[in-house]
Amino acid sequence: MKAVGVWFRSVDTGRYLYLLRNDIKHPGAWGLPGGKIETGETLLGGMERECMEELGSMPDYLRLIPLEKFTSTDNAFEYHTWVCIVDHEFVPVLNHEHLGYAWLDSGHWPKPMHPGLWSTVNLEAVQQKIEAVERSFHTAK
């Protein structure tokens, strides 16, 4: 099974979008929009569909950057995390999967964070990629 998560970053504020989950497995944990890639879907197609479902739209973006690919030890599960650079923060139209949202500054992690996202943001290689993204798309303030 493949799944995808999208971490939106606003150029004008430098902040990242997090969603407050409303599910059985990780209720009340902060995570990213995303989910399972359906049979026959590409990663990009699944990402766009999940954003349409969970945010109400797929915002126009400047760039889409692969951040991490997690593969389970049995190779049965892959999770692809992408950073999606947008010009401005937007107000998502949340579906039943989420209770709220927050745009937060880099390094200010919401708590509790979904364990998969927590693992991702604590990898040194991911932190280096995030720093490179932030240098490339610095805040326009």
Question: What function would you assign to each model-found segment?
Answer:
Residues G35-V126, A140:
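Unchanged
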Residues K25-G28:
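A conserved beta-turn-beta hairpin within the catalytic core of GNAT-like acetyltransferases
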Residues M1-L17:
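Conserved N-terminal beta-strand and adjoining loop/helix that marks the start
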Residues G31-L32:
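A short gly/proline-enriched turn/hairpin at secondary-structure junctions
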Residues L20-R21:
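C-terminal lobe/hinge of AMP-binding adenylation domains
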Residues R135-K141:
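Short intrinsically disordered terminal tails
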